[in-house]
Amino acid sequence: MIRIKDIPQVALRTALFALLKDGQSCDVFGDVPERAALPYITLGAMTFRPVGNKTAVIWQATAGIEVWADGNQQQEMNDILNDICVLFSYYGADLEIEGYHIIGTELESVETWPESVTGYHGTVTVQFTLQKGKVQQ
């Protein structure tokens, strides 16, 4: 078994945050300000599972991209979720994730539901297979 020295959580978060900031017209927050105007996007839960072999550190990672909207913004939320899926399908495989190479990407799921505090909540879950270092060509 190869020794794991880091988890690509910060690098993946940074790359996703940059993609969303550049590709969305609504606000994207790491830490949501107290009186933030809806709708907005946050990065949600992430999971990392090592799937490497004897010679490579490989991670299977999922990331939740959260959209929050008020009770009158269901259509806006759906439009934002759609835009996120388009962004990911066009640019997800080309993200620069510091210290890692993207082996594969997949749009895993899109979910929406009424939310008691804000009005509506949606999540896009994306999946990455990441290999430590540069892949030999």
Positions of PLM-derived features:
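Short, charge-patterned binding micro-sites
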Residues: 34-35
